[in-house]
Each structure stands twice: as structure tokens, then as C-alpha cells.
Amino acid sequence: FENFRKRSEKEKSQMFDMGAKTIVEKILPVIDNFERGLAAVPDDKKDDPFITGMDKVYKQMLTELDAAGVKPIECVGQEFDPDFHNAVMQVENDELESGTVAQELQKGYMYKDSVVRHSMVAVVQE
């Protein structure tokens, strides 16, 4: 009976994580839009109360995602890893070694130990 209870708890936890991962996948485009929108604000408008409010909402969303176990994948300067990165282009770069991620085109995220979205990257060509 004890084994059945443990197995049931593990299955319930896995089902919860699958549901949470699905929700995170749906929230990531919203985060992307916040980042694009805030990046497009001219420097002379960054102190506008509406813009500072939107920035605070964006940062609060990131804080809550982090607390829930969602973390961005660090990639620039790292060796390309197909488990975490999706290479969408190759670039020349004299400062980085071949096979190194030179640029992040879209941020990737992990939920706990699994990739929710791979980072879309530019890799230094050989």
C-alpha cells in the first residue's frame, strides 16, 4: 500500500509539472512582447509614468516566474548545446571560438529541470 501511495504522489506531481509547463509556454510570448515593447521606448520617454509602470509589471512577472522555477537559459559566450539552443544562423566572429553562441535572438527558458523553450541563437561558424 505504501508503494502505491508513493507512486500516486509522484504521478500527481508529474501531472502538475506538465500543466505548469504548458502554462509557462503560453506566458513566454507575453514576456517577449514586454521585452520588445520596452526595448522600443526612446531614451527620452523612459521616465514616463506609463513606461515605468509597464517596466515594473514586467519585472514582477519575471520575479514570479523565477519563484515558480522558471529560469532563462544563459547562452551568449557558451558552447552551442542542442539540448538548450536552436541554431538559426551562423556568424563570423574573431573574438569567439567556433561553435560558440555569439548572439541570442530569442531567449530560452527552463522550468525546473526541463527546457520549456530552446534559445534561438547565432553560432560562430567554423
Indicate where each model-derived feature is located.
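Charge-rich, N-proximal long alpha-helical rod segments
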Residues: 2-35
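Structured alpha/beta interaction-core segments
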Residues: 33-126
